[in-house]
Amino acid sequence: MRISLNWLRELVEIKLSPEELAHILTMAGFEVEDIEDRRTWANGVVVGRVLERQPHPNADKLSVCQVDVGASETLNIVCGAPNVRADIYVPVATVGAYLPNIDLKIKPAKLRGVPSQGMICSLKELGLPSEVDGIYIFPQENLPLGSDVRPLLGLDDVILDVTATANRADALSMVGIAREVAALTDAKLNIPEPGEVSVSGSVGKLGLKIADTQACPAYIGTVIEQVKIASSPEWLQQRLRSAGVRPISNVVDITNYVLLEWGQPLHAFDQERLKFVANADSLTIGVRFANPGETLKTLDGQTRNLTTQNLLITANDQPVALAGVMGGEETEVHEGTQSLILEAALFDSVAIRRSSRSVGLRSEASGRYERGVNRAELEIANRRALSLISELAAGVIVHQEIADTRPDPASWSRSILLRLDRVNEVLGPINVGETGELEAKDVERTLTALGCELTPAGEGTWNVSVPPYRYRDLEREIDLIEEVARLYGYDNFCDTLPDKAEAGYLPVDQELVRKLRAALRAEGLTELIHYSLVKPGEDRQIVLSNPLFAEYSALRTDLLAGLIDAFQYNLEQGNGSLNGFEIGRIFWQEEDGLQEKDAIAGIIGGDTSLGKWSKGSKEQPLAWFEAKGILESVFQQLGILVEYQPDCRDERLHPGRTASLWIGGNRLGIFGQLHPQLRRDKDLPESVYVFQLDLDVFLNALDKDEILVPTFKPYSTYPASDRDIAFFAPVKVSVSEIEKAINKAGKGLLESVEIFDEYRGENVPQGQRSLAFRLVYRASDRTLTDTEVEPVHNKVREALVEKFGVNLRS
């Protein structure tokens, strides 16, 4: 927003230079992007009067003028403007003047043989916008000749280009900036307070119909007659130009002026044009959302196709304006306007934001409504506009209608508890010659300057009543603390670091999950993420009562279904087999209520020989033990021992190639090959394996000191002693049980056990199988002798016979 210091000085006493004021505003959180010092634009330009104008003897488009600038002699000036004539007052750049906007220094010159001792200026040459082709002619008469033109043209001003943060809607007005400057500098405010307006006229000329009071909580419509449309007075035009707004006419300029002064958007309708659009003599101004298919031609000449998101102003239900965004071209004020309807309203910020975006149109009004307009100053801004229209356009107020559904004014302010201890805890010590803390009087003075009312609620505690114009951004105690820091000055607080600083760290669970992810990625698995919402229809599913889509209306009961579908989809898209894993939450119903837990699942499969290098023409699908080896490699990296037991409960998995996984007697999860029928239904490769593990059980197993902080165990440098053992064992006895018994019996010297042969068939007793194991014995401090190994090995043999009834073959 462009801030005129001349205008600002009328609202608040300013004794600072523009640069000092810009620094204070910047340190308080308002970015001053530019300081436009207009005082340098017309240095040496004075008021002159054209006494005589003669055609140039050597050029048809030039004139030779005699100009009186209050000096002892008149100046002979050659001018090329078509509107120059005798007996007018004009700005004259005298010899020696420099015009920075056109980079021109005035010197005596000869133009087509005629001497010229200066230049009669246009507004553009002085840096001001102008729609007139030619020099500027002062509308005033009897101006003092030779006087400085800068006060007459508003060039004795400095403009600050200030950007307010998004939460400071109150700072989008001159009054808001004045309040801020007063709070920062302890200056006195002089905010104009318009008086009450009198309504003199008949009743019933206007009706209001608000269809959605949430979108429009307040609307004031005022009928004004006998209006005389003309140019605005020079002071008003100068203020609009300084703010970057083009003057149009007195009524339109007044609405723009009040917008800049109070931050309240207004709109003026031509009453006769409203009646023409409504096709009726009596008018009902309405506020409603647009119907599909409606259109509106806005003031910028564009025809807008409206949607149900557009909030409209209507005349007898005919669209005449985009509420809070832009008026309609059919009802705009023009030179022949004699009666008005002035709109002053409050619109919901969300409704205006949606309406503005849906048509791709933003305006000064919509920008303010989107941030939030002060609902307590609607009547003030309306009275200000009405008094100016009465004064500058001779308007007579004949009728006013008000629709107001705002809550009680007492609710326009909120009360927040503020603690002095909390203020000092958050902000820290201040520099007051020596390190100290903010005192109660400092907090009270700062917040009172902002317009807050403080009521003591105990020692070092206040109930702070926030003014209505700060209602939207001062909501919590921390907001008030920020205001104290901002106004007291961030640079007045000590910049010392806290005495103690602890390095951040991840919780153990998060650290372990990261290690788990890294281990799975190291095995070539890609992490996948799927929606938690799935199709309904499974047992024990939790179904949502208000789903966004019917096909995503239930919570997933496991992760495997999503992984299998992803594997199938990648094959269909020609991307090959997808080896991946997912960590996520699953949900299900029990008799005692709803349950949820974290799980980790994965899918592995396809032909491992596929790639850029040919390994033969025959497919080499992944074997069960190869897939199991990938999982075991992950377990080995994490330092945990997992047991496998046969399992056939999941119908999606092969009943003979599925195992449940156990850790320390707790069920960890399941691993197995997809059922052949499911594989055929989904057209998947021959060998696809999946696993799903309970993440909580997994993390509990990992949460041990020897795993979290592994210690190095030196390798033995002594040779090993190998022994093979073969026997017939019942088929019902698993290899894992046998290995467990061998490890227990050989504990101390036994380093490893590995099965290397299994045989079923001829010469093997019914119901048994032949198994062969290799046992490796080793000591860390010596070379083992046969006399040391044999007793331990015999103990292993005896344990197998005693526990499983095996028939030893070696």
Curated annotation (Swiss-Prot):
Gene Ontology CC annotations of this record: phenylalanine-tRNA ligase complex
Pfam families assigned to the protein according to its UniProt record, in alphabetical order: B3_4 (PF03483), B5 (PF03484), FDX-ACB (PF03147), tRNA_bind (PF01588), tRNA_synthFbeta (PF17759)
EC number: 6.1.1.20
Domain B5: 411-495
GO molecular function, one term: tRNA binding
SMART domains on file: B3_4, B5, FDX-ACB
Cofactor: Mg(2+)
Example GO BP: phenylalanyl-tRNA aminoacylation
Gene3D superfamilies, A to Z: 3.30.56.10, Bira Bifunctional Protein, Domain 2, Ferrodoxin-fold anticodon-binding domain, Nucleic acid-binding proteins, Phenylalanyl-trna Synthetase, Chain B, domain 3
Residues involved in Mg(2+) binding: D473, D479, E482, E483
Domain FDX-ACB as annotated: residue spans: 716-809
Keywords linked to the UniProt accession: Aminoacyl-tRNA synthetase, ATP-binding, Cytoplasm, Ligase, Magnesium, Metal-binding, Nucleotide-binding, Protein biosynthesis, RNA-binding, tRNA-binding
Cofactor note: Binds 2 magnesium ions per tetramer.
Main location, first listed in the record: cytoplasm
Reactions catalysed, as given in the entry: tRNA(Phe) + L-phenylalanine + ATP = L-phenylalanyl-tRNA(Phe) + AMP + diphosphate + H(+)
Keyword ATP-binding among record annotations: yes
tRNA-binding domain mapped to chain residues: 39-150
Recorded family membership: Belongs to the phenylalanyl-tRNA synthetase beta subunit family. Type 1 subfamily.
Subunit: Tetramer of two alpha and two beta subunits.
Name the record gives this protein: Phenylalanine--tRNA ligase beta subunit
Organism: Nostoc sp. (strain PCC 7120 / SAG 25.82 / UTEX 2576)
Gene that produces this protein: pheT
